[in-house]
Amino acid sequence: MDQLALFFVLLVGAVVSVPVGERLKLPAPVLMTLLGIALAVPGFVPNVEIPPELILPLLLPPLLYAAVRRTSWRQFTANLRPILLLAVALVFVTTAAVAAVANAIVPGLPIAAAVALGALVAPPDPVAATAVAGQLGLPRRLVSILEGEGLFNDVTAIVLYHVAIAAAVSGSFSWPRAALQLVLSAVVAVAVGVALGWAANKLMDFLEDATLQIGLTLLVPYASYVMAEELHGSGVLAVLTTALFLAEYALGADDVLTRLAGHTVWDVVDTLVTGVAFGLIGLELHNAIRTASGRWGEMLGWAAAVVVVVVLVRLVWLLPATWLARRWHAKRDYDEEIPMSWRETVVMWWSGMRGVASVALALAIPLETESGAPFPDRDEIVFIAFGVIMATLVLQGLTLPWLVRRLGVRADEGAEKEFEKALAVRAAKAAKRRLKEIEEVEELPEEMSERLLRRAFEIGVRISPEVGEDERREGHEQRVRRLRRMRRIQGEMLSAARHEVLAARSEPGANPEVVDRVLRHLDVRSLR
């Protein structure tokens, strides 16, 4: 199997793993990792050599951008303290603990190389956290914190990693210089992210066409990452800043086509890139195994020790961190935004899977130092890193669904439905208010006014059928039944129209572009 065919298999696997994972109640990223491991059987696939300097720039920007689209600035600020405790403080603590243990158990491992190992295994993967948490029906507050942690911990870890690698390669280290580098990297990244977000927002207003606007959103994450890296800033933080800016300001209320099509396009991108990323993790396993070269027992022992450190440090940190977060938020009346039970804390602890970023950083370790000597214990670091990635991703990823079901941690569906219902009522009332405003300045026929009033009510019923239940209780049962009947008949009429247009594709002389254009009109009409 050549590399092109292998890439195609990963793409197909990315699509198939979603329904298979839903049936098996297993996260799709874990299934893709297992597929990569199966494909990595010696002799079945070629030795896949992926340039490490391309993994982060190619995979992370779209994945991070897609993840940020599911959150908001309000959610981020509401969970700021818990996120900082996990995404910044915990990364530092995990790096220090892993470095200390690795320096003690791996003979001759320099402290700078040990810190590099600690930094690359410290951050839970944002893609794994988002993909796994999103499929398990976890409470929104818990998902928000996991997503926030996953999105921002890479920034801290990557800067620590670069500082440690520079120290190991040059043989010298300066804490003041490292601190200055961290601050400058963050400042440059935020500046680039805001500037590109503002420019992209203005350009989207200028383009107007939905196809071009969506195409621009596909390019913006890469532009943000590359520009920040060229200016010695954090590409990851720049992408996050740009995505948050555009999520708040990019699309107006009337950008319907861009919003509908954009969600579909980004769902496809997210599914495919996530699948390929985790498939590559499994494929890289055979490269890590080759580095053991007869020292299986010893190196597996080192990897197991680091896995234990990573898992235990997260637990020991989370217990006081969640207590502190509860105290802080209680004073600001934000209790609903943080884990309030020990069950949710346990789920958060077991959700610390490592993934794409750790793989990229492990593969990016240089081969030589400035003096031309081999990088100290590079093979050992790579093997230990992949041991941690596989143990956390596969073991925790496979057992997390069982743990969630066992503990009974799930989203409050009743509260979500009530919120959806309240929004539906607000939307319908806003439509009615606007109709009254128009009637004050325009004279509308009574029949038209009544029809428009029914449409305003139907807006609420379409969003949340429970709005109709309320109307029924208020004595409007007949009107609700008539509206639902009309919707059913209109749906059947539009279905017949679509079938007729699709049949025209196979008629002699039919212009497929015209057929598609008419079909798009019918599709949009069906969504109303």
Regions found by a protein language model. Name each.
Residues 442-454, 460-528:
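Soluble N-terminal domains of membrane-associated systems
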Residues 407-468:
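Long, amphipathic alpha-helical stalk/connector segments used for oligomerization, subunit docking
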Residues 1-418, 422, 429, 437, ...:
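Transmembrane helical cores of multi-pass secondary ion antiporters/exchangers
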